[in-house]
Amino acid sequence: MKLFLTSLLLIAALAAPAANNPAVESMQRKLDRIQANGESAHPRPLTTTMTEQEVNAYVASGRVRLPKGVQSARFSGKPGVVDSVARVDFDQLTAGQRSANPLLSMFSGVHEVAITAHASGAQGVGHVHIDSVALDGVQIPDFVLQMFVNHYIKPKHPNLGIDNTFQLPDRIDSAAVGNHELTVSQK
């Protein structure tokens, strides 16, 4: 489950609830139940729905390690689509890597990044496709985004990109983004 959420974290944004937030505790219980069921010798069919509020509170609580440079992340869902907004310090994110390409120079300093992605999971396989990315409200052309991914993301995370396919953890068979929620099912 954390891998799926981490993939979605590449799609990021802003929130900071209190440490004992009921939404954080509810999310933790759900993740624990999913993990325990997935590790069971005889897992039972289990469907778990996580609300947008729970996901955002959990991410903001610090229980999910955001990539270096991602200062905050907030997600919203509608059927099959995840929208996110993140505050990203590109100098931290790209530390130690520079490019002579002037098109990549926009990826420096601290910016608000808005991402829209299609996300789903079926037959134990998750799929995330980044549809669009905006930097401080300005749409990033696809070819520039692909250059950024190739130069800064792929060297550290070769399995991440614009299109992502991965094995769902904990015997999760399906994952569906709905209106302000994420529902996962284990077989």
Per-segment meaning from a language model:
Residues 9-18:
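Hydrophobic h-region of N-terminal signal peptides that target proteins for export
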